[in-house]
Regions:
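Intrinsically disordered, metal-sensing/regulatory segments
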Residues: 1-258
Length: 261
């Protein structure tokens, strides 16, 4: 039951963010949007380090001086995976007029949802891998640590759902349709997490690689998309403050979890 709840928490964050379309008349002000993007970046970087990379290295201590290999290899593969997906899957980022990936005839709204869905893949994997490690009774992953990651990603997902649904409404879509598309962008997370957990018995031997793989993919999203979007135009300093706040909150949450374990 705890595991099921844990993998649904990030999706709940996306759903709540998308639900803002029922309460807000206009798009989020640029200043607030920059703050949210910076905050999301800080949360994801902190989660990548403390919930994924460090446990990956701790699990590889038996390799002695080569303990860094699983973390390094997995991290690199995670970045390459998202880079490949970015090139192959047609998608459109907010504020951009030209779609990325392979050329296709998909509607603009569909490609907007695909862009966020693409970035939610590693987050779902990250949650699934961590809970799989917890179920496998790995001493380097606690239930509190797994929930800290899940809650952190949910916090990051809230502005994502919001940033998708409000622009869709502004472009003429109904509130319900905008909410549905914003919510749909996050459905890949619980699905990916559940599949990962179901394969737990098979992935345990390569868990360090999978943890760092998820970290690499999440860092790619931050560096490739979130930070550039947060830095463009005015209010870039607000994004930096948001990054610091998100990073510190995740650090405090992680420290609290370690004290309770």
């Amino acid at each position: 039951m705890n595991t099921f709840l844990g993998i649904l928490i990030p999706f709940a964050g996306t759903t709540l963010g998308a639900a803002c379309v029922f309460f807000l008349k206009n798009e989020i002000k640029p200043l607030v949007q920059k703050m949210l993007l910076g905050f999301a970046s800080g949360v994801m970087i902190a989660a990548s380090v403390w919930s994924l990379l460090i446990p990956s290295m701790d699990m590889s201590e038996h390799m002695g001086k080569l303990a860094f290999i699983p973390a390094a290899v997995g991290f690199g593969l995670g970045i390459l995976f998202l880079l490949l997906m970015d090139r192959l899957i047609p998608h459109l980022h907010l504020g951009c007029s030209e779609p990325e990936g392979k050329k296709c005839s998909l509607k603009k709204n569909t490609m907007l949802v695909l862009a966020v869905t693409l970035h939610n893949i590693p987050e779902g994997m990250a949650v699934g891998v961590v809970f799989a490690g917890m179920l496998a009774k790995n001493s380097d992953i606690s239930m509190m640590g797994a929930f800290a990651l899940s809650i952190g990603i949910a916090i990051q997902n809230f502005p994502e759902g919001d940033i998708i649904s409000l622009p869709l409404k502004s472009e003429g879509n109904s509130r319900l349709r905008a909410f549905g598309m914003g919510t749909l962008s996050g459905i890949v997370e619980p699905i990916g997490a559940l599949v990962t957990i179901l394969l737990a018995s098979y992935i345990t031997p390569v868990l360090p690689y999978l943890l760092s793989f998820a970290a690499g993919a999440m860092v790619y999203v931050v560096v490739e998309e979130l930070i550039p979007e947060a830095s463009e135009g005015d209010h870039s300093n607000i994004a930096t403050i948001g990054f610091a706040v998100g990073f510190v909150i995740m650090k405090i949450g992680r420290a609290s979890c370690r004290e309770r374990v």
